[in-house]
């Protein structure tokens, strides 16, 4: 059996006339009759009941016809599907992201991508930068939004593009009554709630380096791997945190976001494999390029 025989069957089933079906198909009647006979032989049952004046579908033919028409429609759609896949208009995009991107670049980037490519399924995975980089290298993700390591020292196989740079702010328990701009040097104690260095070395070093530069000892009282959890621990009064200014959008009872004196700047960017040719990724890169940043 082949697709040609299915088209022959559908034409005869829809016209119930071998002559008209042959005319529709652009062939003569004898080859059409032979094709149907071969199909019936392969199936081991007749599809049509024939008389000299009349052709009608058998019970098998009537029940099989919808399946054949569905299969033919799917086959006919394959060229357009291939073109849409080639152009990145369909398929999927797998994008990982750090929790700090939830309130900065991620929502706008995803919204713009969904508007530009509504036929693409966006698969989002939250993960720390240290988890994202090897996953992207292994081809498990198309791209990731990360906090880059110092000096952007990423593997040579990966490309990187800065998305945003923003100041850090102090996140303090409401009960502290802190007002900005806050100078950590003026505080009696700076108990920190922070990412573990093993999962976020760049962010960890940025925070601890700033605290030390303001003349305070680095005292970490709690660690968590998600920024939302860190904010919750601050609201519980366990300490203070430094967070991207965009996290002000995360309203949480019991915390206060306070500007810092000479705040450190946190960079967030997009990373992907240089040899990754997925059309859906290329669409994302075109959107990012429109923002005017250059890849490293």
From Swiss-Prot:
GO terms for molecular function: DNA binding; DNA-binding transcription factor activity. It comes from the Bacteria. One of its GO terms (biological process) is amino acid biosynthetic process. The keyword DNA-binding applies. The keyword Nucleotide-binding does not apply. Residues 18-37 bind DNA. Keywords: Activator, Amino-acid biosynthesis, Branched-chain amino acid biosynthesis, DNA-binding, Repressor, Transcription, Transcription regulation. GO terms for cellular component: protein-DNA complex. Residues 1-58 form the HTH lysR-type domain. PROSITE patterns: HTH_LYSR. CDD domains: PBP2_IlvR. InterPro entries: IlvR_PBP2, LysR_subst-bd, Tscrpt_reg_HTH_LysR, WH-like_DNA-bd_sf, WH_DNA-bd_sf. Positively regulates the expression of the ilvD gene while negatively autoregulating its own expression. Belongs to the LysR transcriptional regulatory family. This is HTH-type transcriptional regulator IlvR. It comes from Caulobacter vibrioides (strain ATCC 19089 / CIP 103742 / CB 15) (Caulobacter crescentus).
């Amino acid at each position: 059996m082949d697709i040609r025989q299915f088209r022959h069957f559908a034409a005869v089933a829809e016209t119930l006339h071998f002559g008209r079906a042959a005319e529709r198909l652009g062939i003569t009647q004898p080859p059409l009759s032979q094709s149907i006979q071969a199909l019936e032989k392969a199936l081991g049952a007749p599809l049509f009941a024939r008389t000299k004046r009349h052709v009608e579908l058998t019970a098998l033919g009537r029940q099989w016809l919808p399946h054949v028409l569905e299969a033919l429609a799917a086959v006919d759609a394959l060229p357009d599907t291939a073109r849409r896949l080639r152009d990145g208009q369909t398929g999927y995009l797998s994008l990982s992201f750090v929790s700090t991107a939830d309130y900065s670049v991620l929502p706008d980037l995803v919204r713009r991508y969904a508007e530009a490519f509504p036929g693409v399924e966006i698969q989002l995975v939250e993960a720390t930068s240290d988890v994202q980089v090897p996953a992207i290298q292994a081809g498990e993700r198309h791209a990731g939004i990360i906090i880059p390591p110092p000096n952007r020292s990423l593997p040579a196989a990966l490309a990187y593009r800065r998305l945003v740079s923003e100041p850090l702010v102090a996140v303090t328990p409401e009960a502290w009554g802190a007002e900005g701009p806050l100078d950590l040097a003026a505080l009696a104690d700076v108990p920190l709630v922070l990412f573990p260095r093993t999962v976020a070395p760049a962010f960890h070093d940025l925070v601890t380096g700033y605290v030390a530069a303001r003349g305070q000892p680095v005292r970490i009282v709690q660690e968590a791997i998600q920024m939302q959890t860190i904010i919750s621990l601050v609201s519980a009064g366990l300490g203070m945190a430094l967070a991207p200014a965009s996290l002000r959008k995360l309203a949480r009872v019991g915390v206060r976001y306070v500007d810092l004196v000479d705040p450190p700047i946190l960079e967030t960017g997009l990373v992907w494999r240089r040899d990754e040719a997925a059309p859906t990724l290329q669409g994302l890169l075109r959107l990012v390029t429109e923002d005017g940043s250059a890849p490293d």
